A protein has these predicted regions:
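Immediate N-terminus of the mature polypeptide
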Residues: 1-106, 137-142, 146-161
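Periplasmic polypeptide-binding modules associated with outer-membrane biogenesis and secretion
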Residues: 109-150
Length: 161
């Protein structure tokens, strides 16, 4: 009897450890990956831009191709729609400020809107969008771009972190 209690206690601790590990994670994925409707350009042709040093908060040189695309996607994800007139009026997304704190079904809803906004603004560069995940103060967007053999996983840190 004591051995059964000991095994049950060990099992309970293991399950609790797994639950604690995934407690602050949220994940959204469509039934079918979101696909671009038109032709997709090679990611290496993405326009050049200034490189933003995220740690020093300054511009430092130029970047192009995949690196430029990733930086652009990160800025799009954290920029509230219409906040900065230097960009197009629809640049950014409505969930930029709230998705990092959204939980449960609200995270699912906001992820769907963000995925639609990403596909709308980057449809000429993204072949498929697979998922959006959140862990603590970070978003992880997994997508497929032309010119890269594997999927691209973009990590986006909350601006308030």
């Amino acid at each position: 009897m004591i051995e059964c209690t000991w095994i049950a206690d060990k099992l309970f601790r293991a399950v609790r450890a797994i639950i604690d590990k995934y407690k602050s994670r949220y994940y959204w994925s469509p039934i079918e990956p979101l696909r671009s409707n038109g032709s997709v350009k090679n990611i290496h042709e993405f326009p050049a831009t200034w490189k933003i040093d995220e740690e020093q908060k300054c511009l430092c040189g130029n970047i192009c191709g995949e690196e430029s695309f990733v930086q652009s996607l990160k800025l799009f994800a954290i920029t509230p729609q219409g906040r900065y007139p230097i960009y197009l009026p629809n640049h950014g997304n409505e969930q930029a400020e709230s998705i990092f704190s959204a939980k449960g079904i609200e995270f699912t809803r906001q992820s769907e809107y963000m995925a639609a906004a990403i596909m709308k603004n980057y449809s000429e560069w993204i072949e498929q969008l697979y998922s959006i995940a959140k862990r603590k103060n970070r978003l992880y967007i997994e997508l497929k771009v032309k010119g890269r053999p594997d999927t691209l996983k973009v990590e986006i840190i909350s601006p308030s972190a």
